[in-house]
């Protein structure tokens, strides 16, 4: 069976099934898919392998929740049918990296939910949310943040099991926190545990900045919090604030409560939280508490002090993203949350402690 392109929408690669073999004399079984990456995405590939290793080594039942990278190798352009994969079709690279993973037959989360038409739709959506939150808790236990928990990165199987995929921009928080304490640390420290002999052309460097350590954040922070964007609903206020500090500021620059609250208000507005009746009062209270406990507390202090405070809350980041998805799922089936779920939503969005 020849491999066919099944997803060309990814920013960093195209997915083929049953896959592209590392050795042209071999075949890849239908239980696997492969993602073909451009050689320009070196750090993304190595990072996904490193995170995948940590998941496989520390979560015994990982296959029930995640589809991490199982193997990786170089592939030759001659062995790849470009299809509609733009970066292959345009030949922006002559060498490509293939990452092998379990093939998950199903639909992206919101597409799956859109097809629910029976009276049990609410119960099914609530169950999906519970399962996603359980998966997030398993990542939290090993200090990993997925960081891109959106609909396309959760595939729901025919049996109704959500499987989380794509760990390309995920974070090993042990390394991130260590990088703040000790300076730059390789995000890919555990990569050596998976054989990379066939993809030796990859350079694991994650630094984009050349400034001295006195004027710039550690390269790992620059890599992890790679963009400041208040439009991305998957990210909570804490992440967006950290991204603002890392991308727009320097460690010893002074940040003000006005700057902090302006970012807070923009995020609330762009997420349209205040127009959701069941969240309106909670948003008002959240703003009061955020101003008191964050903006006023860290008014006129060095950026690095606020960053150190926010980074410790990383266990809430993916739960926030999962809750945003829960809200979107409820909107898909045109239902409001029950009173019990309202309280859970408000808590998991971080609107109350």
Predicted feature locations:
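ATP-binding glycine-rich loop module of kinase domains
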Residues: 4, 11-80
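Conserved structural core of kinase catalytic domains
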Residues: 63-124
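Conserved hydrophobic alpha-helix
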Residues: 135-139
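Catalytic-loop of the protein kinase fold
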Residues: 140-157
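C-lobe/activation-segment region of protein kinase-like
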Residues: 162-163, 167-334
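Conserved C-terminal C-lobe helix
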Residues: 342-353
């Amino acid at each position: 069976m020849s491999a066919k392109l099944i997803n060309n929408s990814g920013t960093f690669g195209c997915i083929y099934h049953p896959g592209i073999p590392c050795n042209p004399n071999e075949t890849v079984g239908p239980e696997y898919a492969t993602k073909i990456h451009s050689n320009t995405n070196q750090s993304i590939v190595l990072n996904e392998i490193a995170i995948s290793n940590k998941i496989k080594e520390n979560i015994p039942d990982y296959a029930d929740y995640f589809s991490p990278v199982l193997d990786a190798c170089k592939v030759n352009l001659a062995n790849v049918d470009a299809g509609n994969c733009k970066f292959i079709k345009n030949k922006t690279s002559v060498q490509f990296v293939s990452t092998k993973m379990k093939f998950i037959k199903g639909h992206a989360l919101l597409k799956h939910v859109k097809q629910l038409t029976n009276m049990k739709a609410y119960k099914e959506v609530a169950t999906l949310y519970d399962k996603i939150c359980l998966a997030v808790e398993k990542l939290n236990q090993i200090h990993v943040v997925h960081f891109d928990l959106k609909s396309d990165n959760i595939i729901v199987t025919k049996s109704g099991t959500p499987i989380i995929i794509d760990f390309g921009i995920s974070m090993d928080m042990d390394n991130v926190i260590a990088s703040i304490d000790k300076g730059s640390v390789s995000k890919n420290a555990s990569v050596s545990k998976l054989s990379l002999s066939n993809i030796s052309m990859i350079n694991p460097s994650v630094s984009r900045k050349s400034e001295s350590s006195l004027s710039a954040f550690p390269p790992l922070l620059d890599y992890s919090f790679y963009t400041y964007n208040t439009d991305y609903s998957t990210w909570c206020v804490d992440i967006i604030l950290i991204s603002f500090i890392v991308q727009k500021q320097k460690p010893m620059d002074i940040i003000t409560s006005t700057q902090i609250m302006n970012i807070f208000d923009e995020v609330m507005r762009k997420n349209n939280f205040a127009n959701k009746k069941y969240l309106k009062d909670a948003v008002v209270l959240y703003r009061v508490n955020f101003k008191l406990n964050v903006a006023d507390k860290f008014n006129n202090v060095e950026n690095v002090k606020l960053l150190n405070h926010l980074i410790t809350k990383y266990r809430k980041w993916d739960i926030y993203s999962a809750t945003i998805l829960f809200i979107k799922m409820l909107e898909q089936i045109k239902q409001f949350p029950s009173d019990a779920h309202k309280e859970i939503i408000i808590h998991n969005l971080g609107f109350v402690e």
